[in-house]
Regions:
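Alpha-helical secondary-structure segments
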Residues: 11, 33-77, 159-179
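Hydrophobic anchor at the start of a short beta-strand
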Residues: 71, 92-94, 182
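Periplasmic binding protein-like
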Residues: 5-26, 89-132
Length: 217
């Protein structure tokens, strides 16, 4: 329990823990390797202007434009908090479900907006992009774009690394411009270390490096 953690941390028995170990210890915080996105259902939000209005709402911008009379956000119970601007939208219903129920509702397309948690441990950023190919079973946006599909084909055949990176960036930008896939947040994991323990770091992909850890008694 918390009291036991604080006791262990105070006397040096506990050198590091993921979680909370008392106010006296400042954590090292890094990505947990998961990025949250909002996916907009293009079958229900078929007009680009409507999706862009939702995008502006998500960004907390004023003058968001014409929004649908009713919207449903499908999310997980343990997902990050809904942004204030979105939570205050009077025409929004938040449907926060356990994973199995969330998955069933997601597969049935019972949403206007979908909160999607995506692991960053893919070997290739193009994996996520392929979810939005017209024929993909994971196309939760119901997105159908010949331009985007052509971009994916070019990504798949490009062998020059820098050119391929540019194509991937362009495809991701297209999804954002058309308000289909919108980055929301990056999950964080705090690591609480004893004051004598230093040198532990975490990179943007959530990979912890303990190789440079040092303990000074």
């Amino acid at each position: 329990d918390l009291a036991a953690l604080e006791t262990l941390a105070a006397d040096g028995t506990l050198q590091a823990t993921f979680g909370y170990a008392g106010d006296a210890i400042t954590p090292v915080t890094g990505s947990n390797g998961v990025t949250g996105y909002y996916v907009l259902n293009t079958e229900k939000l078929s007009e680009a202007e409507t999706r862009l209005a939702v995008k502006r709402l998500l960004a907390g911008e004023e003058g968001t434009g014409t929004l649908p009379e009713n919207m449903t956000l499908l999310t997980l119970k343990n997902a990050s908090a809904v942004p204030e601007a979105l939570a205050n939208a009077t025409n929004l219903t938040v449907n926060a479900l356990d994973y199995e129920d969330y998955k069933a509702a997601r597969d049935a397309g019972e949403y206007d907006l979908l909160y999607l948690a995506v692991s960053l441990d893919y070997p290739d950023e193009a994996v996520l992009l392929h979810w939005f190919a017209s024929a993909s079973e994971s196309n939760y946006a119901k997105y159908n774009s010949e331009e985007f599909d052509e971009m994916l084909s070019k990504i798949d055949t490009e062998t020059e690394e820098s050119a391929r990176i540019g194509l991937v960036k362009g495809a991701m930008q297209l999804l954002a411009e058309e308000a289909v896939l919108l980055p929301q947040d990056t999950g964080k994991t705090p690591l609480y270390c004893h004051a004598a323990l230093s040198g532990i770091t975490c990179d943007a992909q959530g990979l912890w490096n303990f190789g440079d850890a040092k303990y000074t008694a």
